[in-house]
Amino acid sequence: MKLIFFVKDGCGVCENAKEKVDFFLEKWNARESVDVETVNLSTSDGLVEAAMRAVAEIPTIILEDTTGEVARWMKKAPPSEDLRTRLGV
Protein backbone atom coordinates (compact mmCIF):
# COMPACT_ATOMS: atom_id res chain seq x y z
CA MET A 1 0.00 0.00 0.00
CA LYS A 2 1.08 3.56 -0.60
CA LEU A 3 -0.14 6.84 0.90
CA ILE A 4 0.51 9.97 -1.13
CA PHE A 5 0.16 13.32 0.64
CA PHE A 6 -0.41 16.38 -1.53
CA VAL A 7 0.60 19.40 0.55
CA LYS A 8 1.78 22.98 0.22
CA ASP A 9 4.40 24.96 2.15
CA GLY A 10 2.89 26.71 5.17
CA CYS A 11 -0.27 24.58 5.25
CA GLY A 12 -1.03 23.86 8.90
CA VAL A 13 -3.89 21.51 8.05
CA CYS A 14 -1.49 19.54 5.83
CA GLU A 15 1.04 19.22 8.64
CA ASN A 16 -1.64 18.12 11.12
CA ALA A 17 -3.03 15.53 8.70
CA LYS A 18 0.41 14.04 8.09
CA GLU A 19 1.17 13.95 11.83
CA LYS A 20 -2.14 12.18 12.52
CA VAL A 21 -1.55 9.54 9.86
CA ASP A 22 2.07 9.05 10.98
CA PHE A 23 0.85 8.56 14.56
CA PHE A 24 -1.62 5.85 13.58
CA LEU A 25 0.80 4.06 11.24
CA GLU A 26 3.21 3.84 14.16
CA LYS A 27 0.46 2.80 16.62
CA TRP A 28 -0.75 0.03 14.29
CA ASN A 29 2.80 -1.14 13.48
CA ALA A 30 2.02 -0.48 9.82
CA ARG A 31 5.00 1.75 9.04
CA GLU A 32 6.90 -0.98 7.16
CA SER A 33 3.92 -2.14 5.12
CA VAL A 34 2.87 1.33 3.92
CA ASP A 35 5.02 3.54 1.70
CA VAL A 36 4.48 7.24 2.35
CA GLU A 37 5.19 9.84 -0.31
CA THR A 38 4.79 13.61 -0.03
CA VAL A 39 4.10 15.77 -3.08
CA ASN A 40 4.64 19.49 -2.49
CA LEU A 41 2.40 21.70 -4.60
CA SER A 42 4.75 24.62 -3.92
CA THR A 43 7.04 23.12 -6.60
CA SER A 44 6.51 22.84 -10.34
CA ASP A 45 6.98 19.05 -10.19
CA GLY A 46 4.37 18.88 -7.45
CA LEU A 47 1.91 20.90 -9.51
CA VAL A 48 2.40 18.57 -12.47
CA GLU A 49 1.86 15.48 -10.31
CA ALA A 50 -1.26 17.04 -8.77
CA ALA A 51 -2.66 17.88 -12.21
CA MET A 52 -2.05 14.32 -13.43
CA ARG A 53 -4.01 12.98 -10.45
CA ALA A 54 -6.77 15.62 -10.53
CA VAL A 55 -5.82 16.98 -7.10
CA ALA A 56 -7.47 20.37 -6.55
CA GLU A 57 -7.58 20.65 -2.73
CA ILE A 58 -4.93 20.51 -0.04
CA PRO A 59 -4.29 18.45 1.77
CA THR A 60 -5.31 15.52 -0.40
CA ILE A 61 -4.30 12.06 0.71
CA ILE A 62 -4.50 9.20 -1.78
CA LEU A 63 -4.26 5.55 -0.81
CA GLU A 64 -3.10 3.21 -3.58
CA ASP A 65 -2.58 -0.50 -3.88
CA THR A 66 -1.19 -2.46 -6.83
CA THR A 67 -4.38 -1.90 -8.83
CA GLY A 68 -4.50 1.88 -8.36
CA GLU A 69 -6.37 4.36 -6.19
CA VAL A 70 -8.28 2.81 -3.30
CA ALA A 71 -9.37 5.93 -1.42
CA ARG A 72 -9.00 9.71 -1.43
CA TRP A 73 -9.45 12.17 1.41
CA MET A 74 -9.48 15.93 0.85
CA LYS A 75 -9.06 18.95 3.16
CA LYS A 76 -8.47 16.78 6.25
CA ALA A 77 -6.85 13.64 7.58
CA PRO A 78 -8.72 10.42 6.96
CA PRO A 79 -10.84 9.15 9.86
CA SER A 80 -8.61 6.68 11.70
CA GLU A 81 -11.04 3.75 11.54
CA ASP A 82 -11.60 4.26 7.80
CA LEU A 83 -7.84 4.34 7.20
CA ARG A 84 -7.29 1.29 9.40
CA THR A 85 -9.96 -0.71 7.60
CA ARG A 86 -8.62 0.21 4.17
CA LEU A 87 -5.07 -0.67 5.21
CA GLY A 88 -6.25 -3.96 6.66
CA VAL A 89 -4.39 -3.51 9.94
Indicate residue ranges for each PLM-predicted region:
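Structural micro-motif
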Residues: 53-62
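Non-catalytic, surface beta->alpha helical segment in thiol-disulfide oxidoreductase systems
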Residues: 63-89
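Thiol-based oxidoreductase modules, predominantly thioredoxin-like and allied folds used
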Residues: 8, 30-46
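Non-catalytic interaction surface on structured domains
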Residues: 21, 33, 62-66
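Local sequence-structure signature of Cys/Sec-based thiol-disulfide redox active-site neighborhoods
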Residues: 1-30
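Short alpha-helical
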Residues: 12, 45, 78
